[in-house]
Design a protein with these regions (language model features):
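Short helix-loop-beta junction
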Residues: 13-27, 78, 172-178
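Active-site cofactor/cluster-binding pocket
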Residues: 35-40, 48-51, 55-66, 148-158, ...
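Long hydrophobic segments that form regular secondary structure
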Residues: 6-10, 145-147, 154-166, 408-409, ...
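Redox- and metal-dependent alpha/beta enzyme cores, enriched for Fe-S-associated oxidoreductases
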Residues: 2-23, 36-41
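Ferredoxin-type iron-sulfur electron-transfer modules and their immediate structural context
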Residues: 310-314, 323-452
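Active-site phosphate/pyrophosphate-binding segments
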Residues: 98-169, 174-179, 191-192
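Short beta->alpha junction loops
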Residues: 28-34, 93-97
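Phosphate/diphosphate-binding loops
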Residues: 54-135, 201-248, 256, 347-348, ...
């Protein structure tokens, strides 16, 4: 494979593993693209190479092919014509990573599988399911072992502190241990109030994995409402730890989980823990900021830092982060740390409870077909799995899809108080769901209006 940019680390990771299995594969890294050096390319590419895939992270509509592919192909063809190479390998070109599509180990395996074919596709895409042009390569299951010591996922709500907490975790692990730490953060344009997914890797070796975590040793659900909406337990490795922030007790929580989640936890033989982080945050005067509590729970359950060193490191990080806002806030966060360890409880796994609810549909049955197929998949966090045919060919989007996006994630219900309302109309203009609607009426019409 010939490529450049951030996908190199992923390719190297896969190639190193395949070489230990006796496979004859390699990756050639282009470090300087312009001016393109055909001489250095030919020196680096062994004569024994029989098939080459050139990957471009761009699309050139109207061109014969993508830029890097054309440069490599020209260099090889000219060398062959001039007698500088005795053989001309088969060269195919592919696209990857457009619009931030994932490029993981399974994509590299798919490219090598295509190169082994007797007649590989001369042009292909990888990391996308294209059922319109049929250029996409089928992705095999990633069977390569993970080099990470720990892989963790944190599902939070924008502004609850989950992203900041994970960034702090990376700093603590990187500064306080001999290990390497890496983080990726996925959140939508809503930011405050939207879903945030934090990906944390810890390894004894430098981390080359430039892709998101698909299967984790630890999954933290920082908002109980997410249990009904997102496939979190499904992303646990067998025997992994699943932590839920919930107001329910150890005896109550199992029956509250959807049957699908219960079945997955049993199948994976997971360890289930609960903590009432929202209650601790309220008691310590931290409002909705549960990040400190969930940080302590993560370190306590994973034992990444031994003994009380996690507590000491977190106290130091809190003092550094919040000292500018006053010692009182620092001490409130320290208090939350102490309460967090005492408030963690393990829930024994039980058979699937037939009386427990099933996962509700993401959108109402009354929704249009487009909302059921496309919007619903995106709301469930499965938008990347949508085929090309599911999306409008001209890129237009139907109007009014927000009305079906009822997330039901609030812990408290706001109540309009007539005596406090100044009728500024800001809430009417700002609310995307039109919970409160304004009407323009004449004084005469108001006289005939009902009382409410």
């Amino acid at each position: 494979i010939v490529l450049m940019g951030s996908a190199i680390g992923t390719c190297e990771e896969v190639v190193d593993e395949l070489l230990t299995r006796g496979e004859k594969v390699g990756v050639l890294k282009v470090r300087l693209y312009r001016p393109f050096s055909a001489k250095h390319l030919l020196a680096a590419l062994p004569e024994s190479a029989r098939a080459v895939a050139v990957l471009d992270r761009t699309k050139e509509p109207g061109a014969q092919a993508e830029p890097l592919y054309l440069d490599v192909m020209t260099a090889l063809a000219e060398a062959f014509n001039h007698g500088e190479r005795e053989t001309l390998p088969r060269v195919i070109g592919g696209r990857y990573g457009l619009s931030s599509k994932e490029f993981g180990p399974e994509c590299v395996l798919a490219v090598f599988a295509e190169l082994r074919e007797a007649k590989p596709k001369p042009r292909f895409t990888v990391g996308i399911y294209d059922d319109v042009t049929n250029l996409s390569l089928p992705l095999p299951e990633n069977t390569l072992p993970s080099n990470a010591k720990l892989e963790a996922l944190f599902y939070g709500l924008g502004s609850d502190g989950s992203v900041s907490a994970t960034k702090n975790n990376i700093k603590i692990i990187g500064n306080s241990t001999p290990w390497y730490a890496q983080g990726y953060f996925v959140y939508d344009s809503k930011k405050a109030g939207g879903l945030t997914v934090s990906h944390l890797r810890v390894s004894e070796h430098p981390i080359r994995s430039a892709y998101l975590i698909s299967q984790a040793d630890f999954v933290g659900c920082h908002q109980l409402q997410f249990i009904d909406k997102y496939q979190m337990a499904e992303r646990l490795k067998p025997g992994g730890i699943f932590l839920i922030n919930t107001p329910y007790s150890v005896d109550e929580v199992w029956a509250r989980l959807p049957q699908e989640v219960q079945a997955v936890l049993n199948q994976k033989k997971a360890r289930l823990f609960v903590i009432n982080a929202a209650k601790i945050a309220r008691e310590c005067g931290l409002a909705a900021r549960i990040n400190t509590v969930m940080q302590m729970a993560f370190f306590h359950l994973t034992n990444i830092l031994p003994g009380d060193s996690a507590l000491m490191e977190l106290q130091g990080a809190i003092a550094k982060s919040y000292s500018s806002k006053g010692q009182e806030l620092v001490e409130r966060n320290w208090q939350a740390l102490a309460l967090a360890r005492e408030s963690l409880f393990e829930v024994p796994l039980q058979p699937v409870n037939a009386a427990s609810p099933n996962r509700p549909p993401v959108v109402s049955d009354a929704a249009p077909d487009f909302v059921k197929t496309v919007t619903a998949a995106m709301l469930a966090g499965l938008g990347d799995a949508l085929p090309v045919s599911a999306l409008p060919p001209d890129g237009t989007w139907p109007m009014g899809t927000t009305r079906w996006e009822k997330r039901n994630i609030a812990e408290a219900i706001p109540i309009w108080k007539e005596e406090l309302c100044t009728q500024c109309n800001h809430c009417v203009a700002a609310c995307p769901h039109s919970a409160i609607r304004a009407k323009v009426v004449s004084p005469e019409e108001m006289e005939a209006a009902p009382a409410s």
